[in-house]
Amino acid sequence: MIDIILTTNSPGEVASWVKPVVEKLNELNIEKNIYVFTPPCVFSSGNEGRVLSELNGITAAFNSRQYLKYILLNIKPDNFKPSKKGFILFLGGDFMHAVFLGKKLDYPVYAYTERDYGFPKSVKKYYLSDKKLYNKMTKDGI
């Protein structure tokens, strides 16, 4: 069993990035849990959890309150049962939340980004859609 933990926040990211990623992951013939954390974000609508719960293949989705309790107080959400093997995939929000989860679970962190990058020493690999950003990151030694 492998855990695939996605971090995202706003409705746009849930619709544009999480949904197609989950659909592709569902095509893989592997035993997996797909967990989605929606850390605190000023752009959050509050409806992300409901939308995520309607997506086929997501094992569980956690709101910002559950995320904070887990990160700060080590109180796991009831339906979060991490295995020994997994990874974090950043799909939006603040990079630090994906990094915190990666450190807590000892999972590598991967990130998809269109505009910036953060915590380069803590992110194993970046996935980019923009050649200009790739050139900037390369110039910066990332």
Which residue stretches match the model-derived regions?
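Nucleotide-activated donor-dependent transferases that construct or modify glycoconjugates
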Residues: 1-11
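Active-site and donor-binding regions of nucleotide-sugar-utilizing enzymes
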Residues: 11-142
